[in-house]
A protein has these predicted regions:
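Conserved short S/T/G-enriched processing/targeting/catalytic segments and their helical context
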Residues: 2-92, 129-204
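Hydrophobic, aromatic-enriched interface-forming segments
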Residues: 101-129
Length: 204
């Protein structure tokens, strides 16, 4: 699994993810893009879980962003249904590849600037079971996944604190799994009105 953290204020959105990725069949390690921008609208998508599923969601969201009537609110409302519609084919592909059911899981965050509301907005989506609809949860201040290693760590948008939080999470996940499942480099997605930036904070 991966690292996915979100800090939200009225005028700023900060997301951090790790870059550790591995091929589900061969196990070969690589670096993955788990936070991607829709920069013309100051919007980002980030993930913890299946990279292939995330890239499909990003592709559809990016295509939608070209519509003349596009709004963050509309994409936010549609995304849960889109996840549910795509899930059967994804689950089928996982089964046909002979992969364990644990690969059928995704956590996504959609966030960005809302001209309509005059503030930053973010929503979390989770899907684990084809029989149940995607869980959709508005983010009001913060989200940490995994949250266990940060129970005693106060939320902060300061870069050193974001880096330390990611380092703690990667260490916790790797120790819990008995192998490397998180790490690589820590990427930071930063949004404010008129600005959409991704920064590399370094190796964790």
């Amino acid at each position: 699994m991966s690292i996915l953290n979100v800090l939200l204020s009225t005028d700023q959105l900060v997301v951090t993810v790790d870059t550790w990725a591995e091929d589900a069949v061969s196990g070969q390690a690589s670096a993955g893009a788990k936070v991607l921008l829709i920069p013309q609208h100051q919007i980002l998508l980030a993930t913890r879980g299946s990279a292939q599923f995330f890239l499909r969601i990003y592709q559809l969201s990016l295509e939608a962003s070209f519509r003349a009537d596009f709004t963050l609110e509309q994409l936010t409302a549609e995304l849960g249904r889109v996840i549910d519609q795509l899930w059967p084919n994804y689950a089928k592909a996982v089964a046909e590849a002979g992969l364990p059911a644990e690969y059928c899981t995704t956590e996504l965050v959609l966030g960005g600037w809302s001209p309509k509301s005059g503030r930053m907005m973010a929503t979390a989506y989770a899907k684990h079971d084809a029989a149940e609809p995607a869980v959709v949860q508005p983010i009001t201040g913060q989200l940490s996944s995994p949250g266990e290693p940060l129970q005693d760590w106060p939320p902060s948008m300061a870069t050193p604190d974001l880096f330390e939080a990611g380092r703690r999470q990667a260490q916790w996940l790797n120790e819990r799994s008995g192998r490397k499942v998180a790490g690589g480099r820590l990427l930071l997605g930063f949004l404010q009105q008129g600005q959409a930036v991704v920064k590399d904070l370094g190796a964790i």
